[in-house]
Amino acid sequence: MNLQEMNARKEKIRNFSIIAHIDHGKSTLADRILEQTETVSKREMQAQLLDSMDLERERGITIKLNAIELNYKAKDGETYIFHLIDTPGHVDFTYEVSRSLAACEGAILVVDAAQGIEAQTLANVYLALDNDLEILPVINKIDLPAADPEMVRQEIEDVIGLDASEAVLASAKAGIGIEEILEQIVEKVPAPQGEVDAPLKALIFDSVYDAYRGVILQIRVIDGSVKVGDRIQLMSNGKEFDVTEVGIFTPKAVSRDFLMAGDVGYVAAAIKTVADTRVGDTVTLASNPATEALEGYKEMNPMVFAGIYPIESNKFNDLREALEKLQLNDASLRFEPETSQALGFGFRCGFLGLLHMDVIQERLEREFGIDLIMTAPSVVYHINTTDGETLEVANPSEFPDPTRIENIEEPFVKAQIMVPNDFVGPVMELAQRKRGIFLTMDYLDANRVNIIYHIPLSEIVFDFFDKLKSSTKGYASFDYEISDYRPSNLVKMDILLNAEKVDALSFIVHKDFAFERGKVIVEKLKKLIPRQQFEVPIQATIGNKIVARSDIKALRKNVLAKCYGGDISRKRKLLEKQKAGKKRMKAIGSVEVPQEAFLSVLSMDEE
């Protein structure tokens, strides 16, 4: 292709993504767009086609982002090239969203006609506005009996401030309004900027590991072009690789001769290790490099940490390999080796949130077949010591001696909760119970309220989301961003089994709740740990002070069964002998802690 043809082709490219709250019909809309543009034959079509992980389809959520090229013949007779970049809607995966938005010029905002705007819709819209995207509102599910498109139209204008007069009324499920959406993309989404003949500049927005071809980069070409045989260079570390294949996804990978400015596709270049490629890095040509890199993504810091241990200790290396492979595709997962007296060798992993943690655990068990024990999640605390140091600690077992601690700061989040009027009471009560600090409350319309709180992240990590859903019958929607660190009155609670500390059961708790939490956990463990041949005391301690105790009674054999009648001293002798044996057992006996016991520390209910 000569330069003129390339520029003409670039004018026909439209890059867009779909943003929406969970369950507002984003993946279904993507399916309809694929059908309408005949990208996928009827035979291959299946629901949630872009959600390729089993886990995504089961949970009905989108986790990874996917990029696809479609051809659309518009009403003006021209054929346009669409690149649809599918994004997740869940709050834990905003990182994935920000990555896909960086590769687009436009975004379709899907809002449910019955539910209206929800907290994550807002969060994602602000991300899109930060990236200067053209936003096309679509009001979906208009065939629902409860749909009220006009109210939603008004809401989009009032709450987000977008002009919704031309918002498409659609039903992705019934296929209504799909063509209008496609025409709007052609008219309103701008063609990509960028010079076809400038030096190559491409943004890596995802990477996938393939056992045969090495790391495959998903890129959005900003300037220039790349073809097979080019030698590419990664700008962050200067490493060079030879391109073996370039192509696009139509969901399946299809190889092409070249990718040019505006294209979204993949590059394989025999890259061996995942560590060489960073999502957000810039790819350029070694022979004619670009002068400066593109603005990369901001690094996402993991907010929630937990220990992951293989149940069979010889699987440690398998677990490391599995984590490395997951990290290839999941830039936000962090891990480092750690050891625990109770659980042996494992890893301390950092996650964006609880759903992220859940998904990683399930993928490890499913895709790699490793049985795991997860410890209670914790957050990163800042500890100011008496000698003027500040420590960052994410693992309760690394807490310094209480006498060295001046004060402890914990991360707070700014939580935005949208909820129908009737449930304001329960939500505020829940937030207060989770040590929330009330900020503001705005009425969005006659019956929906937006409440903003500062809440400690450690309280959200436990079960805030589940509690919120159950106290509002599922109507609340919730989004949070990290705000700052604040001093809190926190203490570390240890659990002793048979007078031995089990490091994996330690956790950090606010002093006001320490006594109740200790009591609940001790009772829970009593139910979960099987009875032994000897009595096992379970104690919850803060420092050297025991705040709660419960005993697991010993199993015992009736040693008097063979004594008929018999003298009392004979019986006493047998009982004393049994007692001495139990005592000896207790001195050397160790207690097996089942997996449920570790999880019980998680599901701390205020029962």
From Swiss-Prot:
Alphabetized UniProt keyword annotations: Cell membrane, GTP-binding, Hydrolase, Membrane, Nucleotide-binding, Protein biosynthesis
Top-rank taxon, per record: Bacteria
Enzyme nomenclature, EC number: 3.6.5.n1
Primary localization class, coarse: membrane
GO biological process, one term: positive regulation of translation
Domain tr-type G: 11-193
UniProt enzyme class: hydrolase
Name of the featured protein: Elongation factor 4
Origin species: Lactococcus lactis subsp. cremoris (strain MG1363)
